[in-house]
Amino acid sequence: SEVGINPHGKHFETSLFESAEPYTITDINEYLYSAAVIIDGRMPHHEAIDKFNANKDYYMAELRKPLSDTPSVSELGEWLYNTRLADAIESYYNGEETHFLLSEDCTNGGLQHGGIGFHSTEMMIPANVGGAPEQLDSHGMLQAKLGLTSRDTAKDIHQPLLHGSSMHTLASVLECSVREAEIFVTKAYGKSVLNIEKIADWGVAVATNNNTSLLWKTRDGFNAQSIAYVETVPLTIKFIADRNSQGWGQLLLHKDMPLLKSVKGELVYGGGSSSNKAKVGGTVKNRGLYANVTHSVDATALRDIIRATGGKGLWKHDNFLVPGLMTLVRQTYRQALLAEYDFKAYDAAMVDILSNYNGEAPAKPTLVYGDATKDSIINSHYYLAP
């Protein structure tokens, strides 16, 4: 049977890809930084490079540690990447070319884009775009600030929060009341973080039968949309079939369908029970506006980097795997963040949605902006990391 390898998949899949053309490493420090951070954890660039140079044999041996007899999928990915990184470093010292793709990704891209979009210092600092002199761990900081039991719990909060989930959802994760959930997130990220729920709520309110696709333009002029729909609605298809006595047959399909409401504002399909067949269907997906604007901002930054590098690399969301171009990637990503600060993507998207709207829409919410300046981004160095 065929086995597919997904270039946008797990770590072990992306680690199998390499540059089609060999290249000579010119800035070895980028590779040494990655090696030291992978083995010892986050640290400043200069410290990582000094540590590697002081004990090269140790780091090379650690990168090439044998795989266990029963590795997990995660361990397999780490082993593949680490051994290939060691081979690339060795190629440099031997004066040889390499095909290796060096990888760095955003340190919580969702928090970066929300923070910059709302000029929120409280959000930007833990996302490593607020001018901190060292690389920070946004999950660990949230754990400490809210007194959570584990870093994984902080991840469980960040995921729904940064995708526009309601305070009801966050309250269930935090096991508290809705009001307490609101207090918790504002304690962590200031009042601007409440813009997320406002935008998501507005996206639900403006999604109607005549406006199932909310349309806007990205900073670089591409079209973007957020679609309100119902997942896996059952559809019975009837067709002529002379092979049976009835003369017809039928087939049950499940299909995503655009959001559709009755004159009473009730869903025509989706969210019902088996006793109400008109409403039988899957999950209603109409709360995606905030997340989709964020994804469009992600994609804009990615296009900036692809243009700057001539398309050389493997592109996985906000994870960049490139052949000897990481310094250029970092510089370009910072320029994208600075442009994003000026553009105010979330507000701009809502303005565009209103201009494309069919009918009269609810007024867009007034967003709360913080006092962060562009200097915070200019003075940041760890927005991408191994």
Task: Tell me what each language-model feature is.
Residues 143, 279-287:
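Gly-rich Lys/Arg/Thr-decorated short loops/hinges at beta-loop-alpha junctions or inter-strand turns
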Residues 135-139, 295, 317:
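Histidine-centered active-site/metal-ligand motif
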Residues 294, 308, 312, 326-330, ...:
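Extended, charge-rich low-complexity regions and/or helical-solenoid scaffolds
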Residues 254-269, 277, 303, 330-386:
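C-terminal, non-catalytic extensions of nucleic-acid polymerases
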Residues 107, 286-302:
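Conserved pre-motif C helix in the palm subdomain of viral-like polymerases
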